[in-house]
A protein has these predicted regions:
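Hydrophobic alpha-helical membrane-insertion segments, chiefly the h-region
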Residues: 14-23
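N-terminal Sec-pathway targeting helices
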Residues: 1-10
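Signature of Gram-negative chaperone-usher
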Residues: 5-6, 22-186
Length: 186
């Protein structure tokens, strides 16, 4: 065993030398700042609003009290009439339709008597339909946090002998990304 002692000491000494050569202390340095990349992908967004006389989104279009005189009356689009606004971050195509005839119980005013025009696209006076009609193609992108607005002129003829009462229908504006398939709902 005495003969092995020098070998054991030599082996231990070699292990210390080899360990010292490969020893790399781990040190952490405190820093006054830390940097991390952050990313967020913004999706294509189609967003519109329709307003009447400066009211809120989807405000009721109130044409007031009208005589049953078979005369066409008009309401110019703009801040005191109908407007559509886009907040989209892509080019859009804008469509319009109505739910059907203006109804008051079993009485009605034909939908052909309700018309629209303009949309800042020289849209000629056109009777509403129950299927979507394209009224503005490739409507641009507003500046960030802004909107673009177009006026919508409205026209209504109340036929002779239309019974008194409140007649209603629903106007739908819908938008899709430019050159996409036309909407079918709502």
């Amino acid at each position: 065993m005495k003969g092995l002692l020098p070998l054991i000491l030599l082996g231990g000494l070699m292990m210390l030398v080899v360990g010292a050569l490969y020893y790399q202390p781990v040190t952490a340095q405190a820093s006054p700042s830390a940097t991390q990349p952050l990313q967020a992908e913004v999706e294509p967004t189609v967003a519109i609003a329709a307003t009447w006389a400066g009211g809120g989104n989807n405000s009721t279009i109130d044409l007031g009290s009208l005589p049953a005189d078979n005369m066409e009356r008009s309401w110019p689009g703009g801040s005191s009439g109908e407007e559509v606004h886009t907040y989209s971050n892509v080019y859009i195509d804008l469509y319009v339709r109505a739910s059907g005839d203006l109804q008051n119980g079993s009485n009605s005013i034909p939908l052909d008597n309700l018309k629209y025009a303009d949309y800042d696209a020289s849209v000629s006076k056109t009777a509403f339909d129950t299927v979507y009609a394209l009224v503005k193609k490739d409507w641009g992108i507003p500046s960030q946090s802004g909107s673009l607005t177009v006026p919508v002129d409205l026209y209504l003829t109340v036929p002779f002998a239309t019974l008194p009462g409140l007649y209603t229908t629903t106007i739908y504006h819908a938008a899709v990304q430019a050159n996409a398939t036309a909407p079918t709902t709502p």
